[in-house]
A protein has these predicted regions:
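Extended, highly charged linker/hinge segments and catalytic-adjacent loops that couple domains
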Residues: 18, 32, 38-41, 97, ...
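Short acidic, hydrophobic short linear motifs in intrinsically disordered regions
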Residues: 58-62, 69-83, 108-112, 271-286, ...
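Short amphipathic alpha-helical interaction segments
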Residues: 88-103, 293, 302-308
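Conserved phosphate/pyrophosphate-binding and hydrolysis machinery centered on Walker-type P-loop NTPases
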Residues: 65-73, 87, 91, 115-119, ...
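Phosphate-backbone binding and catalysis cores of DNA-processing enzymes
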Residues: 1-63, 160-225
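Generic, well-ordered alpha-helical scaffold segments in large soluble proteins
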Residues: 3, 49, 82-86, 97-100, ...
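A glycine-rich phosphate-binding loop feature that marks nucleotide/adenosyl-phosphate handling sites
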Residues: 14-24, 100, 118-122, 142-153, ...
Length: 308
Protein backbone atom coordinates (compact mmCIF):
# COMPACT_ATOMS: atom_id res chain seq x y z
CA UNK A 1 0.00 0.00 0.00
CA UNK A 2 2.83 2.41 0.89
CA UNK A 3 4.64 1.67 -2.38
CA UNK A 4 1.41 2.25 -4.35
CA UNK A 5 0.84 5.61 -2.64
CA UNK A 6 4.47 6.60 -3.20
CA UNK A 7 4.21 5.68 -6.89
CA UNK A 8 0.83 7.40 -7.33
CA UNK A 9 1.94 10.65 -5.67
CA UNK A 10 5.38 10.78 -7.28
CA UNK A 11 6.18 14.06 -9.04
CA UNK A 12 8.66 13.64 -11.86
CA UNK A 13 11.43 16.22 -12.28
CA UNK A 14 13.59 16.75 -15.37
CA UNK A 15 17.35 16.35 -15.58
CA UNK A 16 19.89 16.50 -18.40
CA UNK A 17 22.74 14.21 -19.47
CA UNK A 18 25.66 15.53 -21.51
CA UNK A 19 27.72 13.22 -23.69
CA UNK A 20 30.40 13.35 -26.37
CA UNK A 21 31.30 10.82 -29.07
CA UNK A 22 34.86 9.99 -30.11
CA UNK A 23 35.99 7.98 -33.11
CA UNK A 24 39.03 5.84 -33.85
CA UNK A 25 39.68 3.33 -36.64
CA UNK A 26 36.11 3.52 -37.95
CA UNK A 27 34.52 2.74 -34.57
CA UNK A 28 33.18 5.13 -31.95
CA UNK A 29 32.58 5.36 -28.21
CA UNK A 30 30.37 7.62 -26.12
CA UNK A 31 31.65 9.36 -23.00
CA UNK A 32 29.24 10.81 -20.43
CA UNK A 33 29.55 13.70 -18.02
CA UNK A 34 29.73 12.06 -14.57
CA UNK A 35 27.00 14.24 -13.06
CA UNK A 36 23.45 14.78 -14.25
CA UNK A 37 22.40 18.42 -14.58
CA UNK A 38 19.33 19.35 -12.55
CA UNK A 39 19.27 22.89 -13.91
CA UNK A 40 18.44 23.45 -17.58
CA UNK A 41 20.46 26.66 -17.86
CA UNK A 42 23.53 24.98 -16.40
CA UNK A 43 23.12 22.01 -18.75
CA UNK A 44 22.81 24.23 -21.83
CA UNK A 45 25.80 26.34 -20.75
CA UNK A 46 27.94 23.20 -20.47
CA UNK A 47 26.67 21.98 -23.85
CA UNK A 48 27.61 25.29 -25.52
CA UNK A 49 31.20 24.98 -24.28
CA UNK A 50 31.70 22.06 -26.67
CA UNK A 51 32.15 22.81 -30.38
CA UNK A 52 32.94 20.87 -33.53
CA UNK A 53 36.57 21.97 -33.07
CA UNK A 54 36.87 20.62 -29.52
CA UNK A 55 39.66 18.14 -28.79
CA UNK A 56 39.68 15.83 -25.78
CA UNK A 57 42.61 14.39 -23.86
CA UNK A 58 42.37 10.81 -22.61
CA UNK A 59 43.72 10.99 -19.07
CA UNK A 60 42.90 7.53 -17.72
CA UNK A 61 42.55 4.03 -19.16
CA UNK A 62 42.01 1.20 -16.70
CA UNK A 63 41.56 -2.46 -17.61
CA UNK A 64 40.96 -5.26 -15.16
CA UNK A 65 39.58 -8.77 -15.04
CA UNK A 66 36.35 -9.08 -13.06
CA UNK A 67 34.23 -12.09 -12.21
CA UNK A 68 30.49 -12.55 -11.84
CA UNK A 69 29.87 -15.32 -9.34
CA UNK A 70 27.67 -18.27 -10.24
CA UNK A 71 24.28 -18.03 -8.50
CA UNK A 72 23.46 -20.20 -5.51
CA UNK A 73 21.09 -23.13 -5.81
CA UNK A 74 17.38 -22.42 -5.45
CA UNK A 75 15.44 -22.24 -2.25
CA UNK A 76 11.68 -21.96 -2.70
CA UNK A 77 11.57 -18.16 -2.70
CA UNK A 78 14.37 -17.81 -5.27
CA UNK A 79 12.63 -20.35 -7.52
CA UNK A 80 9.33 -18.49 -7.20
CA UNK A 81 10.98 -15.18 -8.08
CA UNK A 82 12.68 -16.53 -11.20
CA UNK A 83 9.59 -18.41 -12.37
CA UNK A 84 7.64 -15.17 -12.06
CA UNK A 85 10.29 -13.13 -13.90
CA UNK A 86 10.98 -15.54 -16.74
CA UNK A 87 7.68 -17.43 -17.11
CA UNK A 88 5.05 -15.23 -15.41
CA UNK A 89 4.13 -18.00 -12.97
CA UNK A 90 2.63 -16.92 -9.65
CA UNK A 91 4.29 -17.92 -6.39
CA UNK A 92 1.39 -20.25 -5.54
CA UNK A 93 1.49 -21.88 -8.97
CA UNK A 94 5.25 -22.41 -8.76
CA UNK A 95 4.92 -24.01 -5.31
CA UNK A 96 2.12 -26.26 -6.53
CA UNK A 97 4.19 -27.41 -9.51
CA UNK A 98 7.34 -27.91 -7.42
CA UNK A 99 5.31 -29.99 -4.96
CA UNK A 100 4.00 -32.10 -7.86
CA UNK A 101 7.56 -32.66 -9.10
CA UNK A 102 8.58 -33.68 -5.57
CA UNK A 103 5.73 -36.17 -5.33
CA UNK A 104 6.89 -37.64 -8.65
CA UNK A 105 10.36 -38.01 -7.06
CA UNK A 106 11.92 -35.69 -9.66
CA UNK A 107 13.19 -32.97 -7.29
CA UNK A 108 14.10 -32.65 -3.62
CA UNK A 109 11.75 -31.19 -1.00
CA UNK A 110 10.61 -27.79 -2.33
CA UNK A 111 9.60 -25.95 0.87
CA UNK A 112 13.17 -25.12 1.77
CA UNK A 113 14.69 -21.87 2.96
CA UNK A 114 18.28 -22.92 2.26
CA UNK A 115 20.30 -22.34 -0.91
CA UNK A 116 23.08 -24.71 0.12
CA UNK A 117 23.76 -28.44 0.26
CA UNK A 118 25.98 -30.41 2.66
CA UNK A 119 29.10 -32.31 1.57
CA UNK A 120 27.39 -35.73 1.58
CA UNK A 121 24.81 -34.49 -0.95
CA UNK A 122 27.59 -32.88 -3.01
CA UNK A 123 29.11 -36.35 -3.43
CA UNK A 124 26.14 -37.28 -5.64
CA UNK A 125 26.09 -34.05 -7.67
CA UNK A 126 28.53 -35.09 -10.47
CA UNK A 127 26.36 -38.11 -11.30
CA UNK A 128 23.21 -35.96 -11.25
CA UNK A 129 24.76 -33.33 -13.52
CA UNK A 130 25.92 -36.04 -15.91
CA UNK A 131 22.24 -36.83 -16.44
CA UNK A 132 21.20 -33.17 -16.62
CA UNK A 133 23.59 -32.36 -19.49
CA UNK A 134 22.04 -35.11 -21.62
CA UNK A 135 18.62 -33.41 -21.46
CA UNK A 136 17.55 -31.57 -24.64
CA UNK A 137 17.52 -28.16 -22.87
CA UNK A 138 21.18 -28.40 -21.86
CA UNK A 139 22.79 -30.71 -24.40
CA UNK A 140 24.67 -27.93 -26.20
CA UNK A 141 26.05 -26.48 -22.96
CA UNK A 142 26.92 -29.98 -21.79
CA UNK A 143 29.35 -30.52 -24.66
CA UNK A 144 31.89 -28.23 -22.97
CA UNK A 145 30.85 -28.65 -19.33
CA UNK A 146 33.67 -29.96 -17.13
CA UNK A 147 32.42 -32.34 -14.45
CA UNK A 148 35.86 -32.66 -12.89
CA UNK A 149 36.14 -29.11 -11.51
CA UNK A 150 32.75 -28.16 -10.11
CA UNK A 151 32.10 -24.83 -8.41
CA UNK A 152 31.50 -25.49 -4.69
CA UNK A 153 30.04 -22.10 -3.73
CA UNK A 154 26.68 -23.72 -2.87
CA UNK A 155 28.25 -26.36 -0.60
CA UNK A 156 28.11 -25.38 3.07
CA UNK A 157 26.55 -27.63 5.69
CA UNK A 158 26.46 -24.80 8.25
CA UNK A 159 23.95 -22.93 6.06
CA UNK A 160 21.58 -25.85 5.58
CA UNK A 161 18.43 -25.57 7.68
CA UNK A 162 15.79 -28.32 7.93
CA UNK A 163 16.08 -29.08 4.23
CA UNK A 164 18.87 -28.45 1.73
CA UNK A 165 18.54 -26.48 -1.51
CA UNK A 166 16.35 -27.62 -4.37
CA UNK A 167 18.06 -30.10 -6.71
CA UNK A 168 16.94 -32.78 -9.16
CA UNK A 169 17.03 -36.41 -8.06
CA UNK A 170 18.26 -38.07 -11.24
CA UNK A 171 14.92 -39.72 -12.01
CA UNK A 172 14.21 -39.25 -15.72
CA UNK A 173 11.30 -36.79 -16.21
CA UNK A 174 8.54 -38.28 -18.36
CA UNK A 175 5.01 -37.20 -19.18
CA UNK A 176 5.32 -33.74 -17.66
CA UNK A 177 2.81 -31.01 -18.36
CA UNK A 178 4.12 -27.86 -20.04
CA UNK A 179 4.20 -25.98 -16.73
CA UNK A 180 5.92 -28.87 -14.93
CA UNK A 181 8.56 -29.05 -17.67
CA UNK A 182 9.22 -25.31 -17.28
CA UNK A 183 9.78 -25.51 -13.51
CA UNK A 184 11.84 -28.69 -13.79
CA UNK A 185 14.03 -27.00 -16.42
CA UNK A 186 14.51 -24.03 -14.07
CA UNK A 187 15.65 -26.27 -11.19
CA UNK A 188 17.91 -28.44 -13.36
CA UNK A 189 19.34 -25.38 -15.13
CA UNK A 190 20.06 -23.66 -11.83
CA UNK A 191 22.00 -26.76 -10.75
CA UNK A 192 24.15 -26.43 -13.87
CA UNK A 193 24.62 -22.71 -13.25
CA UNK A 194 25.50 -23.13 -9.58
CA UNK A 195 28.22 -25.72 -10.24
CA UNK A 196 29.62 -23.98 -13.34
CA UNK A 197 32.64 -21.64 -13.39
CA UNK A 198 32.34 -17.92 -12.71
CA UNK A 199 31.67 -15.59 -15.65
CA UNK A 200 34.94 -13.86 -16.55
CA UNK A 201 34.86 -10.33 -17.99
CA UNK A 202 37.33 -7.67 -18.96
CA UNK A 203 36.28 -4.31 -17.54
CA UNK A 204 37.38 -1.12 -19.31
CA UNK A 205 37.13 2.36 -17.77
CA UNK A 206 38.27 5.46 -19.65
CA UNK A 207 38.22 9.10 -18.62
CA UNK A 208 38.86 12.23 -20.66
CA UNK A 209 38.70 16.00 -20.40
CA UNK A 210 36.85 18.15 -22.91
CA UNK A 211 36.74 21.94 -22.58
CA UNK A 212 37.64 21.62 -18.90
CA UNK A 213 34.88 19.09 -18.17
CA UNK A 214 35.32 15.45 -17.19
CA UNK A 215 33.73 12.63 -19.18
CA UNK A 216 33.76 8.89 -18.54
CA UNK A 217 33.09 5.64 -20.34
CA UNK A 218 32.70 2.22 -18.76
CA UNK A 219 32.08 -1.14 -20.40
CA UNK A 220 32.80 -4.82 -20.03
CA UNK A 221 33.41 -7.63 -22.50
CA UNK A 222 32.72 -11.25 -21.62
CA UNK A 223 35.89 -13.32 -21.99
CA UNK A 224 34.46 -16.60 -20.69
CA UNK A 225 30.70 -16.77 -20.05
CA UNK A 226 30.97 -19.64 -17.57
CA UNK A 227 27.59 -20.19 -15.86
CA UNK A 228 25.87 -17.55 -17.98
CA UNK A 229 26.06 -19.81 -21.03
CA UNK A 230 23.49 -22.20 -19.52
CA UNK A 231 20.50 -19.97 -20.40
CA UNK A 232 22.25 -16.97 -22.05
CA UNK A 233 19.68 -14.57 -20.59
CA UNK A 234 19.98 -10.82 -21.03
CA UNK A 235 18.59 -10.46 -17.48
CA UNK A 236 21.92 -11.78 -16.15
CA UNK A 237 23.70 -8.73 -17.55
CA UNK A 238 25.33 -6.48 -14.95
CA UNK A 239 25.45 -2.69 -14.78
CA UNK A 240 28.82 -2.53 -16.56
CA UNK A 241 27.29 -4.22 -19.62
CA UNK A 242 25.06 -1.53 -21.14
CA UNK A 243 22.13 -2.53 -23.33
CA UNK A 244 22.63 0.29 -25.80
CA UNK A 245 25.44 0.63 -28.31
CA UNK A 246 27.91 2.84 -26.48
CA UNK A 247 30.59 1.98 -29.02
CA UNK A 248 33.70 -0.18 -29.03
CA UNK A 249 36.54 2.26 -29.76
CA UNK A 250 39.50 1.99 -27.37
CA UNK A 251 41.93 4.84 -26.72
CA UNK A 252 45.35 5.12 -25.11
CA UNK A 253 46.19 7.28 -22.13
CA UNK A 254 47.52 10.65 -23.29
CA UNK A 255 45.84 10.51 -26.72
CA UNK A 256 44.23 13.66 -28.05
CA UNK A 257 41.08 12.97 -30.04
CA UNK A 258 38.80 15.43 -31.89
CA UNK A 259 35.16 15.34 -30.85
CA UNK A 260 33.07 13.54 -33.46
CA UNK A 261 29.73 14.54 -31.95
CA UNK A 262 28.03 15.66 -28.76
CA UNK A 263 24.56 15.92 -27.34
CA UNK A 264 22.37 16.91 -24.43
CA UNK A 265 19.54 14.53 -23.55
CA UNK A 266 16.61 15.54 -21.36
CA UNK A 267 15.28 12.80 -19.10
CA UNK A 268 13.00 12.64 -16.09
CA UNK A 269 13.12 11.00 -12.70
CA UNK A 270 10.96 7.92 -12.26
CA UNK A 271 9.22 6.53 -9.19
CA UNK A 272 10.19 3.24 -7.68
CA UNK A 273 8.17 0.66 -9.64
CA UNK A 274 5.11 -1.04 -8.23
CA UNK A 275 5.75 -4.46 -6.75
CA UNK A 276 5.56 -7.53 -8.93
CA UNK A 277 5.32 -10.94 -7.29
CA UNK A 278 9.07 -11.35 -7.79
CA UNK A 279 10.03 -8.02 -6.22
CA UNK A 280 7.50 -8.52 -3.41
CA UNK A 281 9.16 -11.84 -2.56
CA UNK A 282 12.51 -10.04 -2.42
CA UNK A 283 11.01 -7.39 -0.14
CA UNK A 284 9.66 -10.13 2.15
CA UNK A 285 13.13 -11.65 2.42
CA UNK A 286 14.71 -8.28 3.18
CA UNK A 287 11.92 -6.72 5.21
CA UNK A 288 14.25 -4.86 7.59
CA UNK A 289 16.32 -2.96 5.05
CA UNK A 290 13.97 0.00 4.72
CA UNK A 291 13.42 0.54 8.46
CA UNK A 292 14.79 3.97 9.34
CA UNK A 293 15.65 3.16 12.97
CA UNK A 294 19.08 1.50 12.94
CA UNK A 295 18.56 -0.59 16.09
CA UNK A 296 15.23 -1.92 14.87
CA UNK A 297 16.71 -2.60 11.43
CA UNK A 298 19.48 -4.74 12.92
CA UNK A 299 16.96 -6.61 15.06
CA UNK A 300 14.98 -7.85 12.05
CA UNK A 301 17.88 -8.02 9.59
CA UNK A 302 17.98 -11.79 9.30
CA UNK A 303 14.33 -12.57 9.97
CA UNK A 304 12.44 -12.06 6.71
CA UNK A 305 8.69 -12.59 6.70
CA UNK A 306 8.86 -16.27 5.88
CA UNK A 307 8.62 -18.72 3.04
CA UNK A 308 5.45 -18.32 0.97
Amino acid sequence: CARFKENWNFVSTPYWQLHIALKKDYVHRQFFHPEDFRDKNGAEAAYRRITSDSVVTINKVERKTVFQQAPLLYDLTALQKDCNIHHDLSADKTLSIAQSLYEKKLVSYPRTGSRYIPEDVMAHVPALLEKVITMPWFREYGRTFDLSGLNTRSVDATKVTDHHALIVTGVVPEGLSEAEAVVYEMIAGRMLEAFSPRCEKESLKMECVCEGMDFRSQSAVIVNPGWRAVFSRKEDREKDEPEGNGGTAVFAEGEEIPVMGYGLAQKKTLPRPLYTEATLLTAMENCGKEIADGQAREAVKELGIGTP
